[in-house]
Amino acid sequence: MANIIKLGSLYLDDCPADTEIVYNSGQAIRIGEAVPGKEISWVVVNNMLIADRCILTKISWDNLKANDLVFGKEVSIGGFRFTVRLLQVGAEKDEPNEWDAALDAVGEDDSIWHWKDAYFWVQEPGKIGSSRYWGSRSSGYRNASLGFRPALVPLNTKHQDEIRIGEQLRLWGGQSIVSGRLEEISDYEMVLSDWDGTLFGDFGSRISDGRIVIDQGAIAGAQRI
């Protein structure tokens, strides 16, 4: 089962843009605050967020590198900090990689990942259709079926804006995602009321009066809602 979150928007030359559009060489690319109707959809998986589709097409690896989007740069969305970057898949075909790990965790269904006829750049040079096919192209290569599927990796929440009692939050970690009203917070736990979402593993547990307690150490990211 995949959990999807809408977070942030794509900007081209500082203008909010739709996703799945053709890139014009030379445009400045960034991911920033969400604009209604132009939000990016992300799959919550393995303590990170991976775009559920290519958000730009006909873009080269060199174009992405010129915008510091290959190996990662820091962005702030909704008061929280992330590194936005390409996925890591390893230099050899049989090496463990983040894409395979994501497919193993939530499944390969095209309705989740929109991978059919939509290849994407990764950090490493590779060696085509199943969801796990990989190949290689020169860094300057551009094609309408080859695009930019970013990943967001949450940074340490201790350096983010203060979270206050009474705020409506969405918290995620692993494959778990929950939202609710923050009732209590400590160095070790958060307690939410009026919550909904999906719990897996040791992320959290249900307590009295329809509340849940979340292990602070299991939280990978947060969003005010």
What function would you assign to each model-found segment?
Residues 199-225:
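Intrinsically disordered, low-complexity, charged/polar segments
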Residues 59-71, 207-210:
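Extended Gly/Ser/Thr-rich low-complexity repeat segments
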Residues 39-42, 161-163, 181-185, 204-205, ...:
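Short, exposed beta-strand/loop patches in secreted or surface proteins that constitute
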Residues 44-48, 52-66:
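Aromatic- and glycine-enriched beta-alpha-beta binding-site module
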Residues 31-42, 181-184, 194, 219:
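A structural signal for short, hydrophobic beta-strand segments that form beta-sheets
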